[in-house]
Swiss-Prot record:
GO terms for biological process: ribosomal small subunit biogenesis; rRNA processing. Pfam families: PRC_RimM, RimM. This is Ribosome maturation factor RimM. The keyword Kinase does not apply. GO terms for molecular function: ribosome binding. GO terms for cellular component: cytoplasm; ribosome. InterPro entries: PRC_barrel-like_sf (IPR011033), PRC_RimM (IPR056792), RimM (IPR011961), RimM_N (IPR002676), RimM_N_sf (IPR036976), Transl_B-barrel_sf (IPR009000). The lineage of its organism: Bacteria, Bacillati, Cyanobacteriota, Cyanophyceae, Synechococcales. The PRC barrel domain binds ribosomal protein uS19. Keywords: Chaperone, Cytoplasm, Ribosome biogenesis, rRNA processing. Belongs to the RimM family. It comes from Synechococcus sp. (strain JA-3-3Ab). An accessory protein needed during the final step in the assembly of 30S ribosomal subunit, possibly for assembly of the head region. Essential for efficient processing of 16S rRNA. May be needed both before and after RbfA during the maturation of 16S rRNA. It has affinity for free ribosomal 30S subunits but not for 70S ribosomes. Binds ribosomal protein uS19. The keyword Cytoplasm applies.
Length: 186
């Protein structure tokens, strides 16, 4: 089943590999609601080449702690060959299924792509969020490097979704080299 072109989507994960011979997928979770990858129900997959997401209901899923990934089994993906065809695909749910949040909580999908500023200077853009006990923002700098900053109020005091930006106040020394402010060493 192909989704309607009018549907807005939430990214909940991305297929990173096939797993085993029976059509299981390894999925990187991009949602702060991991049950989206463990509880059965409708999910959609979309490759870059697909004009619209395709329905592949979740049969079962589990967290795979050794790799920090989820193993999921979806309808219509019966074997490894079929699973390999979906590597790189996005796992989606309709935006109408967005779960309510408390104040100062954010959906990962709202943070990805935000401009990141430090003392008024563009540091880069949020390229990923690592769920590592405490969420960590991965920031891609214009010169193709990455900076990791824990997503805590003390270090990320301003998140402005309307402006599409956030401001960081990391400890001294963490980002200066990425902004061209290296100090001379003795």
């Amino acid at each position: 089943m192909v989704a309607s072109r009018d549907t807005a989507w939430l990214l909940v994960g991305q297929v990173v590999a096939a797993h085993g011979l029976r059509g299981w997928l390894r999925v990187k979770c991009w949602s702060d609601f991991p049950e989206r990858l463990t509880e059965p129900g409708p999910r959609w997959l979309q490759r870059d080449s697909d004009p619209e997401p395709l329905l592949h209901p979740l049969i079962e899923g589990q967290f795979f702690p050794a790799k920090g990934l989820y193993l999921v089994r979806l309808e219509g993906i019966p074997d490894r060959t079929a699973a390999e065809a979906w590597v790189g695909a996005k796992v989606l749910v309709p935006a109408s299924q967005r779960l309510p949040l408390e104040p100062e909580e954010y959906h990962y999908s709202d943070l990805i792509g935000l401009a990141v500023y430090h003392q008024g200077r563009l540091l880069g853009h949020v390229s990923a969020i690592w769920a590592a006990g405490q969420d960590v923002l991965e920031i891609a700098t214009p010169d193709k490097r990455q900076v990791l900053i824990p997503f805590v109020k003390a270090l990320v005091p301003v998140v402005d979704l309307e402006k599409g930006e956030l401001q960081v106040q990391p400890p001294p020394g963490l980002v200066e080299s990425f902004l061209g402010q290296d100090r001379a060493r003795n």
